[in-house]
From Swiss-Prot:
Mg(2+) binds at residues 488, 494. Component of the RNA degradosome, which is a multiprotein complex involved in RNA processing and mRNA degradation. It holds the Pfam family KH_1. The gene is pnp. Residues 624-692 form the S1 motif domain. SMART domains: KH, S1. This is Polyribonucleotide nucleotidyltransferase. InterPro entries: ExoRNase_PH_dom1 (IPR001247), ExoRNase_PH_dom2 (IPR015847), ExoRNase_PH_dom2_sf (IPR036345), KH_dom (IPR004087), KH_dom_type_1 (IPR004088), KH_dom_type_1_sf (IPR036612), NA-bd_OB-fold (IPR012340), PNPase (IPR012162). Residues 555-614 form the KH domain.
Amino acid sequence: MKSVKKSFQYGNHTVTLETGGVARQADGAVLVNMSDTVVLVTAVGRKEADPGKGFFPLTVNYQERTYAAGKIPGGFFKREGRPSEKETLTCRLIDRPIRPLFPEGFYNEVQVVATVLSMNPEVDADIPALIGASAALSISGIPFDGPIGAARVGYKDGEYLLNPTFEETAASDLDLVVAGTENAVLMVESEANQLPEEAMLGAVLYGHEQMQVAIQAINELTAEAGKPRWDWHPPQGDAALETAIKDLVGDDLAAAYQIPEKQERQNRIGELRQRAVEALGENREEEGGWPEKDVGDAFKGLEKDIVRGRILAGERRIDGRDTRTVRPIDIEVGSLPRTHGSAIFTRGETQAVVVTTLGTGRDAQIIDAIEGERKEQFMLHYNFPPYCVGETGFMGTPKRREIGHGKLAKRGIEAVMPAADDCPYVIRVVSEITESNGSSSMATVCGTSLSLMDAGVPVKAPVAGIAMGLIKEDEQFAVLSDILGDEDHLGDMDFKVAGTESGVTALQMDIKIQGITREIMEQALEQAREGRLHILGEMNNAISGPRSEMSEYAPRLLTIRIDPDKIRDVIGKGGATIRALTEETGTTIDISDDGKVTIASADKAAADEARRRIELLTADVEVGTVYEGKVSKLMDFGAFVNILPGRDGLVHISQISNERVERVGDYLKEGDTVRVKVLEVDRQGRIRLSMKAVQDGE
C-alpha cells in the first residue's frame, strides 16, 4: 500500500497526516507531524464481541518515549516505566471525545495507542495525538461516527490564540482544549485566570470553528485511504420485553426514583431489577423468557426514560429539588488539630475531607517531563476509596479517574495561588472523598479553597466549583445545577465549572449527544455562575479569608535576598559555615543561585537568629562605621579583630590608644571584646581599624 499524506495549516503550525507507511497491520495507523512533534496513533478493533459483555471495552494508551526529545530515561533500568501523570491525563483527554461516537450496543473491544516519536519542546503532543486518534479510527473501518477535530485555545490581550506554544500558553490567561465533530462540541478541558463566562464560551466556539480544517483533512484521508466500514448492525430493541418490564415494575420504579436518600433508593431499585430478572429471564419457571443481559438493558432503558421524562415535564428531581437549587451545604474548618490546614465540605451526600500541608523548597516535586524538567510547588491529590459509595474494593495506586479529578481541582485553584515571593511554601493538598453522590471533584475544589485559607495561605480569592447536567429530547431541554450521580449517569452532559466571584478558573465539559447549541451552553454557564456564587456565600460564612496566623505546627519560613557573589560566604569551605549555622539554630536553609535564601523552622526565634547570622555573614564593611568585635590574634605590630563573621581587620599598634603603646599585650589579649571604627577597606579587601578613633569620638 502506498503512503497517503494530507497537510494543512493550523495556527502557526503545519500539520501532516500520513498513513500507509508505518504499522500496516493495525486496522488504522496515522503518523501526525505538527511542527516536528510526531505522534504515531493506531486503532485496532476485535471483529467479535465477548458474549454477555454489557459495556463498550475501549482502551486508550498514550505513551511518551524519551528518545523523542533526545534523552535516555533515568533510573536503574534505563527504560520507560509506568505512565506519568501527563500520560494518564492525555489518555483521558483522547478517550472522552471519541467514546460517545461509537454506536449504541457496540461492545467489541477497541484499543487506541498513541506513541510520541519526536518532540518539539514548544509543541505539546496532546493535540496531534487527539487528531491522530480521530484519523486512525476514521480510516480503520471500525464503526465510528467521527471524525473529530481538536484545538488548543489561548487568550491574551482580548485575542484568542490558536494552538499556542508552551511559552505562549504560560503567558496566556487561558489554556483550553476543545474537541468535537463537524457540527458539535463534545469535550472541553481548560484552566483560566478568572475569565468571564462570555470569554470562555467564545473560546469554545472559536476552537470548534478553527478545528474544521483538521476534520476536512481527515475526511480527505479517509476518502483516499480508508478501509470499508465493518458490516455491523446494532442490536434491535425488543418491544415486547420493554412493554413487559414497564407493566411489571414501571410504577414501582418511578416511585423508587422519588426516594431522596441514595442508598435506600439504590436498594429499592436493586430489588426491582431482581424482580424483573426473575419474572422475565430465561430461568423463570414458565417456558420462554429473555436473556438476563437483555432484561438488564431494558430495565436501564426504563430507568432512563422515567428520570429524564420527569425532569423534562417540569417535575421535581430525584431528591425533590428544582433544576436550579444546590443541595444543602455543611462546612467545618480547622477540625483536624495537628494538620496545617483542614476543611470538611459536605454538599448533600457528597463529602470531602481536605487537608493542606506546608513544606519547604526541598519538598517540591521534580517533574522530569519529556519537554524539560521543572519543579512543582503546588500539589493536589484526590483519593476516592470504595467506602465512599458503600462498596468494597481494591486500594492501591491512584486510578486514572483519581488522577484526572485531582488535576481538574488543581486547575480550578491554580489561578488564585499566591506568587512564590508572597508565599514561599511548597504546598500539598490532599482531598479524601468520604461520601460520594455526584460532583466530588467540585467538592474537592471548595474544600481545597477552605483548607488553604485555614492554613493561612494568601490565596487571591476563594474558589467554588459546581457540576451541571443536561437532559435533552428533540428541542426540549433542561439544565440541572449540582447534579447527583444518577443524573450524571442518565443525562446528556457533564459540565463542571470552578471559579471565583470574578470569573471562571476551570471548565470541563463532556457531552454525550450531538446538537448542543450555543443557547444551551450559555444557559449552563449562567446557571453555573448563579450556583457558584451561592456556594461562595456559604463558604464565606465559614471562613471569609486566609487566616492571619498559621498553625503552630507549620514551619515558619523567612525569605531574604543576598548578593549572589556572597553565597560562598554563607556556605563556607566545604559547607562548614552553613552546616554549623543549621545545627546551632535548628533550622533548614535553602539557597538558590539568584541569592534567594529561605530559612525554615518550627520556632520563629530560631529562624530570626539564623537570618541575623546570615545578614552578618553577607554584610558589607562600611568605612566610618563602629563595630563591636573580638580580638582574634595578637601580633607585634597590632591586633586582628573579628568584626563580622569571617571578616577580620587590623588595629595597628598606633591605633590602639592615644597613649604610646610599647607592647600590644599590655592593652589587649585574645578574646577581648573591643569597639573599633573602620578607617579604610583597600582594593584587596583588607580592613584598617582604629580603637583610638572610637575614643576620640566619645
